[in-house]
Curated annotation (Swiss-Prot):
Positions bound to Mn(2+) 1: 10, 346-347
Top class in the EC scheme: isomerase
Name the record gives this protein: Phosphopentomutase
Gene Ontology molecular-function annotations: magnesium ion binding; manganese ion binding; phosphopentomutase activity
Source organism per UniProt: Rhizobium etli (strain ATCC 51251 / DSM 11541 / JCM 21823 / NBRC 15573 / CFN 42)
Main location: cytoplasm
Reactions accelerated catalytically: 2-deoxy-alpha-D-ribose 1-phosphate = 2-deoxy-D-ribose 5-phosphate; alpha-D-ribose 1-phosphate = D-ribose 5-phosphate
Family to which the UniProt record says this protein belongs: Belongs to the phosphopentomutase family.
Pathway: Carbohydrate degradation; 2-deoxy-D-ribose 1-phosphate degradation; D-glyceraldehyde 3-phosphate and acetaldehyde from 2-deoxy-alpha-D-ribose 1-phosphate: step 1/2
Underlying gene: deoB
InterPro entries found in the cross-reference section: Alkaline_phosphatase_core_sf (IPR017850), DeoB (IPR010045), Metalloenzyme (IPR006124), Phosphopentomutase_DeoB_cap_sf (IPR024052)
Length: 406
């Protein structure tokens, strides 16, 4: 039998999406622009990193060639490896959204072929009847925010008023989300999660993809910071995913990080919580040790998106990529004959782009493991090819939406 390890570098797009213009993202290229800025010295930060972007391990697995296939050019300032050892390619997204659930579900073989509900960008974001029902059911005196906002900005702006009044901070973005920020000690973490569960039920008729609990600590705008107790309350995928199919065939799915939340805990055998990319890698390595024949370990490395992409932080994103790349040899050392590792992303979030939202981009596909022969798999029609390749590797029947590249 075989094992598979699927690592999603959240938001690590490689540009070139053929439909990017329809999303206002023509020219967006997360990898390409980070490399360009680093090569020009704009990715330097004292005490963090300096110089051109350096990803030697992913480059040897085909990342440079992926970038050229996706966007038409090699990333600036990054040397070409003498030899490529991985299976490498890039994929288009066929789901209509450029959000986290759409990307992950499509990776798992289930594209999202419907439109999510979204909130208006002008005026109040949420209908009065929704707010009234939520405040009544959630036993709060009102809400703050009621707008599109950056999470860190709105906490800094409204956090002190939230502490004084007990009103949760509710906001949204260009994604199909309803986000609730509350101070852990003053409002209470359990109360926040209960409030979000209530919101999940009330928002189902609006077809909103996720309710996100955003707890924070601190007493003033200068000291507020988010904690690792974030929770996502997602709707169920529209049809069985790779995860469900694996469970149906007696396999186990080890969900590391926020994977369990993204799939509404459907198709999951074991949830492993960790906060931050370093801890997520540690947890993934432990899950590799625990995985049995036929199992899947599925990890989302969220820091790229949450801490650096949305915040448009080029040096931070570059440093996080370099730190991830430096730990790949630890993954290699864990592998046994029959193992397969796949690195990919769920969308882009170009830290040089206007605004703070995701960007529509192609994503990288890197696959490697003992006995895996290096080759290009070109540009794939859909992320679903990733899930179908894992299905084939693990010996379960193919699904309807993708084609294996193995």
């Amino acid at each position: 039998m075989a094992r598979a390890f699927l690592f999603v570098l959240d938001s690590f797009g490689v540009g070139g999406a053929p439909d990017a213009a329809a999303y206002g993202d023509e020219g967006a290229d997360t990898l390409g622009h980070i490399a360009e800025f680093c090569a020009a010295g704009a990715g330097d930060r004292a005490g963090l990193r300096s110089g051109p972007l350096s990803l030697p391990n992913m480059s040897e697995l085909g990342l440079m060639h992926i970038a050229r296939a996706a966007s038409g050019q090699f990333p600036a300032g990054m040397p070409l490896p003498e030899k490529v050892y991985g299976v490498y390619g890039t994929a288009n997204e066929i789901s209509r959204g450029k959000d986290t659930p759409s990307g992950h579900w499509e990776i798992a073989g289930t594209p999202v072929n419907f439109d999510w509900g979204y909130f208006p960008t002008e005026g109040d974001a949420f209908p009065p009847e929704l707010i009234e029902a939520l405040c009544r059911a959630g036993d709060v005196p009102g809400i703050l925010g009621n707008c599109h906002a950056s999470g860190t900005e709105i906490i800094a702006r409204l956090g002190e008023e939230h502490i004084r009044t007990g009103k949760p901070i509710c906001y949204t973005s260009s994604d199909s989300v309803f986000q609730v920020a509350a101070q852990e000690a003053h409002f209470g973490l359990d109360r926040l999660l209960t409030f979000c569960r209530i919101a999940r039920g009330l928002l189902d008729p609006y077809n909103i993809g996720r309710i996100i609990a955003r707890p924070f600590i601190g007493q003033s705008a200068s000291t507020f910071q988010r904690t690792g107790n974030r929770r996502d309350f997602s709707v169920l995928p529209p049809e069985p995913t790779l995860l469900d199919r694996l469970l149906q065939h007696g396999r186990h799915v080890h969900a590391v990080g926020k994977i369990g939340d993204i799939f509404a805990h459907q198709g999951i055998s074991r949830v492993i919580k960790a906060t931050g990319n370093e801890a997520l890698m540690d947890a993934s390595l432990s899950a590799i040790d625990a995985a049995e024949d036929g199992d899947l370990v599925f990890t989302n490395f969220v820091d790229f998106d949450m801490n650096y992409g949305h915040r448009r932080d080029v040096p931070g994103y570059a440093a996080a990529l370099e730190a991830f790349d430096a730990r790949l040899p630890e993954v290699h050392k864990k592998l046994k004959p029959g193992d397969l590792v796949v690195l990919t992303a769920d969308h882009g979030c170009d830290p040089t782009w206007r605004g703070t939202d995701h960007t529509r981009e192609r994503v990288p596909i890197i696959a490697f493991g003992p006995g895996i022969r290096s080759r290009s798999i070109g540009v794939r029609r859909t992320y679903a090819d990733i899930g179908e390749s894992i299905a084939r590797h693990l010996g379960i029947p193919a699904g309807p939406h993708g084609r294996s590249f193995l």
